Amino acid sequence: MTDPVTGLTALDVEIFDPPLCCPTGLCGPVLDTTLVDLGEAIISLQAAGRTVVRHMMTADPQAFLRNREVYQLIRERQLAALPITVVRGQIVKTDAYATLDEMRVALEAGLVPASAP
């Protein structure tokens, strides 16, 4: 799918992370199982040939500005909107990480999970 405004091909999955202590978020003294599950989901999708990119606000702020819908959500709800999961250019989940099943449904069936804005 090509973005009509930018002319760029949409990535399969983009994850816009809240501020984390490191790129994976797995660097603190307490292990966050949600982030472990996310890491496993990303590995699974990539093994299936999907392109998955995570954007951290501190490391890649331009990504948050380039995506108009993501930028608008952050302006409206600030950091409470994060994390945001985008599948093929469409927001499919906010406030929590999408599960592997939710991302697969959005990718394979073209359906958007009910929790989308």
Question: Can you name each region flagged by the protein language model?
Answer:
Residues 77-91:
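Extended, charge-rich low-complexity interaction segments
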Residues 3-48:
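Local sequence-structure signature of Cys/Sec-based thiol-disulfide redox active-site neighborhoods
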Residues 87-114:
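Non-catalytic, surface beta->alpha helical segment in thiol-disulfide oxidoreductase systems
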Residues 34-37, 41, 66, 70, ...:
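Amphipathic alpha-helical interface surfaces
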Residues 1-6, 114-117:
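Basic/polar N-terminal segments that are highly enriched at the extreme N-terminus
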Residues 55-79:
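Thioredoxin-like thiol-disulfide oxidoreductase module
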